[in-house]
From Swiss-Prot:
Name of the featured protein: Spermidine synthase
Any one GO molecular function term: spermidine synthase activity
One Gene Ontology CC term in the entry: cytosol
Source organism of the structure: Dictyostelium discoideum
Enzyme Commission code(s) on record: 2.5.1.16
Taxonomic lineage from the root: Eukaryota, Amoebozoa, Evosea, Eumycetozoa, Dictyostelia
């Protein structure tokens, strides 16, 4: 609660020194410390309800769709037949909501280490919680890395919806994790993981893409605009055992497109077009 001063929440972190994003608070809805992290939910004046983990904004009702749609539909529309999907993290439910929009998906497993995040979403993020009770969804509360050690060659698409590489999410940005991801993929499978902002963490992104290129035949980086995240954008690393993920390879039907607020085929392709400073550094 020390992040709220004089009616304003400010996101201050050593992971983006010298930067801060603030929202005016209308009402604190929930605050709790779990075994893994501190989580806070508040109603803001301009961004709706806001979920905060360890002082860092994870989702706001105003702009969450820009992240959830892109991290989900880029890999799913890049795969010819995504039947089995795994989501690591994603306890707010947003990625689940997007995955089950795909008729081809037969099953989706959510692996979340902290059940408190799921409960907070169920109680305070009504537009994000809708996927939890879908018949195609299975919830697993526990360590994602341990879960994948028991799964080999099983998933067509794996999405890592993690927080930043500090605290409980640190291991999700390391080589050993991407080795587990690769082993859990079916032939032609695709990994898509949250991969920070090129404006603030280009060296982190470079390190990740460098070792991923040693593991996967195709490694690419995309990004989306989202005002409530540091730097106003967030990126995704796409690691494919098949072809490129830079354009959708299946039809985006009018029925599916009508459910989107951000994603479409042109945005999919444009998200891989990097400004020169990032393209030069990442050399993808």
């Amino acid at each position: 609660m020390d992040k709220i001063q004089n009616g304003w929440f400010s996101e201050i972190s050593e992971f983006w020194p010298g930067n801060s994003f603030s929202l005016e608070v209308e009402k604190v809805l929930h605050h709790e410390k779990s075994e893994y992290q501190d989580f806070l939910v508040f109603k803001s004046k301009s961004f709706g309800n806001v979920l905060v983990l360890d002082g860092v904004i994870q989702a706001t009702e105003r702009d969450e769709f820009a992240y959830q749609e892109m991290i989900t539909h880029i890999p799913l529309f890049s795969h010819p037949s995504p039947k089995r999907v795994l989501v690591v993290g994603g306890g707010d439910g947003g990625v689940l909501r997007e995955v089950v929009k795909h008729p081809l998906v037969e099953s989706v497993t959510l692996c979340e280490i902290d059940k408190g995040v799921i409960e907070a979403s169920r109680n305070f993020l009504p537009n994000m919680r809708v996927g939890f009770d879908h018949p195609k969804v299975t919830l697993f509360i526990g360590d994602g890395m341990e879960f994948m050690r028991q799964r080999k060659g099983e998933f067509d698409v794996i999405i890592t919806d993690s927080s930043d590489p500090i605290g409980p999410a640190q291991g999700l940005f390391e080589r050993a994790y991407y080795e587990l991801l690769k082993a859990a993929l079916a032939p032609g499978g695709i990994v898509c993981s949250q991969c920070e902002s090129m404006w603030l963490h280009l060296d982190t992104i470079k390190g990740l893409t460098t070792f991923c290129k040693e593991l996967y035949p195709n490694v690419e980086y995309a990004y989306t605009s989202i005002p409530s995240y540091p730097g106003g954008s967030i990126g995704f690393i796409l690691c494919s055992l098949g072809g490129s993920t830079k354009a959708p390879i299946r039809e985006i039907t009018p029925e599916v497109q009508s459910q989107m607020q951000y994603y479409n085929g042109e945005v999919h392709k444009a998200s891989f077009v990097l400004p020169q400073f990032a393209a030069k550094k990442l050399n993808l």
